[in-house]
Amino acid sequence: MSDINTARLPYVVFMSFIPPCVNDDIQVVLTRGE
């Protein structure tokens, strides 16, 4: 189980960083559009 958790950790961390980056990109596009 520890091997599976260790293998999934980078994936979970990577996924947790996606929403803020995507939200920032969307806000920049909306700001430029306005």
Curated annotation (Swiss-Prot):
GO molecular function: toxin activity
UniProt keyword terms in alphabetical order: Toxin
Crosslinked residue numbers (Cyclopeptide (Tyr-Pro)): Y11-P20
InterPro entries: Amanitin/phalloidin (IPR027582)
Domain of life: Eukaryota
Residues of the propeptide: 1-10, 21-34
Post-translational modification: Processed by the macrocyclase-peptidase enzyme POPB to yield a toxic cyclic decapeptide. POPB first removes 10 residues from the N-terminus. Conformational trapping of the remaining peptide forces the enzyme to release this intermediate rather than proceed to macrocyclization. The enzyme rebinds the remaining peptide in a different conformation and catalyzes macrocyclization of the N-terminal 10 residues.
UniProt keyword DNA-binding, yes or no: no
Entry keyword annotation includes Chloroplast: no
Described function: Probable toxin that belongs to the MSDIN-like toxin family responsible for a large number of food poisoning cases and deaths.
Family, as annotated: Belongs to the MSDIN fungal toxin family.
Annotated protein name in UniProt: MSDIN-like toxin proprotein 5
Organism expressing this protein natively: Amanita bisporigera (Destroying angel)
